[in-house]
A protein has these predicted regions:
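Short acidic/polar inter-strand loop motif in beta-rich domains
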Residues: 204-209
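Catalytic core of carbohydrate-active enzymes
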Residues: 1-173, 177-196
Length: 210
């Protein structure tokens, strides 16, 4: 969702967000907006307001600083995700104990690649992608409210190592970095794999999916 600045001096911009969805500022994962709301943003003529719909996957080929995600991601596809639950819930009661599961499945697909995620139950996030002929994948989860307990590479059966900084993650070319201040989790899955990717993130929560 794009709300360009087209008039000088451009000190403010009134944005009406479409109802039925929530939105996150593309440039800042800490800024979120409810669907159906009208918000006046303080902006300058050089700003470019862009918003990601909650629940969506945006694949990015980062090749310049204009994307706001740094040149360190160049050569990889960045799957930028704002996870949500669907409204479909399966609930059941057994011997007085009520349980509920909520499953969310979102998919992005192009000719050479398919990405999807699921949120089958609280604190468990699953991401899968088919192989890309030349590019590895970096998963970027937005609006997180708790860092994960662990990140598992399901294809190779090993735990992905937490890194101390985004720079460390990129320099090693593998691992994950959780930035609670920015409400973002990065998972670097290395170079292009002939088997695709499959990871499970445990113990995480986000603004729109607990």
């Amino acid at each position: 969702f794009v709300a360009p600045i087209v008039e000088a001096p451009g000190l403010s911009k009134t944005v009406v967000f479409p109802s039925g969805n929530n939105f996150v500022d593309y440039w800042d994962s800490t800024k979120t907006y409810e669907g159906g709301s009208t918000v006046t943003l303080n902006v300058s003529i050089t700003d470019f307001p862009v918003f990601q719909r909650a629940g969506s996957i945006i694949p990015l080929e980062v090749s310049s600083r204009l994307t706001g995600h740094g040149l360190a991601s160049d050569g990889h596809l960045t799957a930028m995700i704002v996870p949500t639950h669907t409204s479909t819930q399966d609930s059941q009661s057994t011997q007085g104990v009520h349980t509920a599961t909520t499953t969310s499945v979102r998919r992005w697909k192009e000719e050479s690649m398919d990405m999807s995620y699921k949120w089958p139950r609280g604190g468990l996030f699953q991401f899968q992608s088919t192989p890309h002929p030349t590019r590895g994948v970096i998963v970027l989860l937005r609006t997180i409210t708790a860092c994960p307990h662990s990140v598992i590479d399901e294809l190779y059966g090993n735990e992905i190592t937490a890194q101390a900084s985004l720079e460390d993650m990129h320099s090693k070319g593998y691992g994950y970095f959780c930035d609670l201040r920015a409400k973002q989790l990065f998972v670097h899955l290395g170079h292009s794999s002939p088997h695709g990717n499959s990871i499970t993130i445990k113990g995480i929560s986000t603004l729109y999916a607990l």
